[in-house]
Amino acid sequence: MLIIAKYPSKCFLPAIEKPYPLIVDFLKTRFSRIPKQQWVDRINGGLVFFKNGKKITTESLCVPLTMLLYYRTVDEEISIPFKEKIIYMDDNILAVNKPHFLPVMPAGKYINQNLLTRLKDKTGNNDIVPVNRIDRETSG
């Protein structure tokens, strides 16, 4: 069963010269570990689009200096049972005690089982940005 990330990731399209490449080719080059067919499937499934909401097709050309949003997918994701603890929160700062084995941000096979996604869910704040990223094996 394909698992889709709860929140989109961002990719900025740089200033490039004409002729502009297809977005699918740019993404394949930018994210070389992801097969082109996976990008085609994401695009056809509506999981890749411009930040303004405009749909992208496999024939869409890059538009320099624009933002793409895309949803990561994985075939399976292991549930991480350890819980984070919010230790301080105000309008500008959120301090959290992160458990072992929980990645800070979506990466690799962890697209929903990560601290950032959990905190967005818990607080309702989709603008959270980590300022200290410790690795998956580290707690604190």
Task: Pin down the residues of each PLM region.
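RNA pseudouridine synthases
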Residues: M1-G140
